[in-house]
Amino acid sequence: MKRVFIMLAIVLGSAGLLFAQKSNQKEVKQLQSFLQQKSAKGDANYIRLGITDIKNPAMWKGVVWSDGRAISIDWKDKELAGELDLNGFTALQKVDCSRNQLTEINVSNCTALNTLNVSRNKLSELNIDNCPALVKLDCYKNRLTDLSLSGLPGLKNLNCSNNLFVELNVNGAQQLQSLNVQGCHLESLSVDSCENLKNLYCGYNKLTSLNLFGTVSLSNLNIDDNEISNMLLSKLPSLTSLICSDNNMKTLGVLDCTSLADLVCSYNDLTSLNPDGTTNLYFVDCSYNDLSTLDLSNRTMLQRLICSNNQLNVLDVSFCPVSYTHLRA
């Protein structure tokens, strides 16, 4: 038995030696530097990760290596803290360091990186220059005040909600399909010519206007709880859902949005509502406004209508299949 243990130790030692000889020493040193930083609990980060030998990268929990290069790092929810420098990890494909207390992370020049999740940290800075393969970025619930997508030509999904942005510009992000910027401090949001953008969630901000020029693929739009008093939406043929409640909105124009099915514009100051060209409306909630007339006639797809707490004298739902069990007036 003793001989077996000795042989096993020799094998493991040899494997560790071979890995050390093969590994990228720059990457190892950068990770070692982070592992030795103080964690959120006051001890070292490597202790939080259950790493017993900081000099043996082959045994580091959460890190996957291939040909001596780090290709994946999964260190989520480990009470880690400090600054993580992954600059130049050109084989790295996936990083998940969410639910920690990191203050800075650098993934610039990670040219193979396709997925990055650094949400629920204390990040005030996120360096993501030259990450051409990045498709999905989650950085919500941090302390970011600025974010540039110029080095992310392939980005499709971005969730940067609950940060400290005052303005955000993603103009011309050709591949972007989903953008969530809810719960920030946005006063300005630019999404011009994002021709593949399908989902835009920008509620709970301080926007006074929103230009959707060129967003021809937009399907879901949520601008709840902003400060947009007047809004005109036109020629958005793919738009199926519009939520714009709690804006103190005085005018809302919806023209030629032929796919629109759900319209929620409650808790505003609307005195009229004429969603022209929206023959596919299925659900409308325009409650808590100042409407005196409402004409939704010939909406043959309409199933639910909530229009309570208005000043309605005339309500026209003729030639609509809406049942009175789904009508609140």
Where are these regions (language model features)?
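Conserved small/polar residues in nucleotide/adenosyl-binding loops
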Residues: 325-329
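Right-handed parallel beta-helix
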Residues: 94-121, 129, 138-140
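N-terminal capping/linker segments that flank leucine-rich repeat
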Residues: 4-12, 16-94, 111, 174
